[in-house]
Amino acid sequence: LAPSPEGFLGQSSYLFLRFAESAARHAHDAADLETESTLAIVAEECFARFSALAKTLDTMKVDRVEAMNPFIGPTREFERRTRGRNWVERVACTWVTMAFLQDFWRRLADGLPKAIRGEVMKALEGDTMIHVLRTELERRIALEPTLRPALALWARRLVGDTMLIAESALVHRDNPVA
């Protein structure tokens, strides 16, 4: 199994764009300035990853909009299915899906052509945003311990839905796994 470079970059760049938008909304809806400014770091890092991955498409002379377009519908459906009931569930959704997909994409990027592999791996390195989200969730749970069981169940559900998004990035002999 190896990813199609255009499909891999189209999906990952579009999802990082959506993660940036989600993190910005989380920051906007935060209850205090400390949380708002911390989540702004997540939005900034997601947007930087989007920019780096989209730039790789530009370098390959692939229209970034055309490369991302096939992933708009499935991504928005995924977001609809996984939208949390409240702010904490939405932050948990971003954390679980981002952590899972980023790890998955790092492993899948090993199958990309050597000419772009380094750029992609560099765009995906680092876990600051994952740690920031996790720390915020841990802080919320410490303030309100009754959140823990509900978030644990929510995260289990999210992993299943996120696996379906990950599976759609796989290509075997130019046939996408759907």
Give names to the regions the model predicted.
Residues 1-10, 70-94:
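Acidic/His metal-coordination segments adjacent to aromatic residues that form catalytic metal sites
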Residues 165-178:
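C-terminal accessory extensions/subdomains outside the catalytic/core fold
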Residues 42-71:
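Conserved alpha-helical segments that form or flank metal/cofactor-binding pockets of metalloenzymes
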Residues 1-28:
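N-terminal topogenic module of multi-pass integral membrane proteins
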Residues 106-163:
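A contiguous pocket-lining binding segment that forms or flanks enzyme active sites
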